[in-house]
């Protein structure tokens, strides 16, 4: 850790020193990091730490975008940079009851750097489950070329003057979020759907057109952490109160079809976006392919609309352990003895 700090922190500071020697501070900083890059090679991950470092664009793979401590705010203040300029690092995730669900969720939905730094014994407890469901992080890119909260990036012109070595600086990501919704579109060959993460804010209705969805269509809304199908809605839906057990909400929103369909799965917060390889409806049979994990119960949540009656569930490579109807969906639990 000390070696990392020696290499990547502080060398962009003290402009008076470089001015007295009539040296270009940015050039000196880049030359130093270039030497490190040449030594470790392109295959090694290099992160700038901490604070926004536009001087190192093209050299570093990731950047801690703010000060010490996980920053929800930074994910919206520099969303346009993520996986375009570099990989955003909101800082390490703490698997505490207060932060485990919402921090892992926000990091994964935004496609940011996912770093756990808890004591090993924590990973033997149930609090590790949200991290398991949020990993791996899918590669995502921002859907817009602007920052949702531009309050910090609008100060990037100060980068040449705010280099004292202390911080946070006016352009570094802050710790105070102004937005609480994170939207991720999942586009697969067999289906498209959206995920909406909520970390706080007001409990008010969310219009579908503000999520880029057709307000004239009907959508199933499934809350991932509680595994509750909230219902089928047109125009908008009410998210309800955040459960203090999770401190966040994650909604999977799928267009309602006129036949049984996958509502969600439990393996990953994308509700099938990671492990589902194919889903189809033919001859009144819902079929598909999925990659499962050994000894980890895999749950399919399938709609059962009016006019249809569930008959049976069969699969190869896993055993059907339980089938249970809950409201207007079937919960199918599978168990696999091997990965695949």
Residue ranges and their predicted role:
Residues 1-14:
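Active-site groove signature of glycoside hydrolases
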Residues 107-110, 115, 154-215, 250-257, ...:
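Carbohydrate-binding surface patches
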Residues 23-129, 140-153, 160-163:
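Glycan-recognition surfaces
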Residues 32, 93, 100, 179-180, ...:
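Short alpha-helical segments and helix-capping/turn motifs at coil-helix boundaries
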Residues 43-44, 219, 308, 318:
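A structural micro-motif
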Residues 193-196, 225, 230-340:
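Non-catalytic C-terminal accessory domains or segments of carbohydrate-active enzymes
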Residues 11-28:
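The substrate-binding groove and active-site-proximal loops of carbohydrate-active enzymes
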């Amino acid at each position: 850790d000390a070696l990392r700090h020696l290499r990547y922190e502080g060398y962009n500071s003290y402009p008076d020193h470089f001015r007295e020697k009539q040296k270009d501070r940015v050039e000196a900083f880049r030359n130093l990091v270039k030497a490190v890059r040449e030594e470790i090679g392109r295959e090694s991950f290099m992160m700038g730490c901490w604070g926004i470092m536009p001087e190192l664009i093209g050299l570093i793979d990731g950047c801690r975008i703010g000060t010490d401590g996980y920053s929800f705010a930074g994910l919206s203040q520099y969303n346009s940079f993520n996986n375009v300029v570099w990989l955003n690092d909101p800082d390490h995730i703490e698997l505490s009851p207060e932060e485990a669900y919402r921090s892992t969720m926000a990091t994964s939905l935004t496609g940011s750097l996912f770093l756990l730094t808890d004591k090993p014994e924590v990973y033997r407890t149930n609090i590790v489950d949200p991290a398991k469901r949020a990993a791996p992080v899918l590669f995502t890119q921002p859907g817009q070329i602007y920052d949702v909260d531009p309050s910090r990036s609008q100060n990037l012109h100060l980068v040449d003057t705010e280099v004292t070595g202390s911080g946070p600086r006016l352009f570094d990501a802050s710790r105070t979020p102004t937005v609480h919704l994170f939207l991720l579109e999942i586009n697969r060959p067999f289906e498209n759907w959206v995920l909406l993460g909520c970390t706080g804010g007001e409990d008010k209705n969310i219009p579908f057109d503000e999520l880029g969805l057709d307000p004239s269509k009907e959508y199933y809304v499934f809350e991932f952490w509680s595994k509750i199908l909230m219902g089928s809605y047109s125009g908008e839906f009410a998210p309800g109160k955040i459960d203090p057990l999770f401190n966040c909400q994650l909604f999977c929103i799928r267009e309602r079809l006129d036949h049984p369909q996958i509502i969600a799965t439990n393996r990953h917060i994308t509700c099938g976006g990671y492990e589902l390889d194919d889903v189809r409806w033919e001859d009144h049979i819902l079929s598909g392919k999925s990659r499962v994990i050994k000894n980890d119960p895999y749950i399919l949540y399938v709609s059962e609309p009016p006019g249809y009656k569930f008959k049976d569930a069969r699969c190869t490579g896993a055993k059907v352990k339980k089938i249970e109807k809950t409201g207007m969906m079937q919960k199918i639990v599978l168990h696999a003895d091997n990965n695949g």
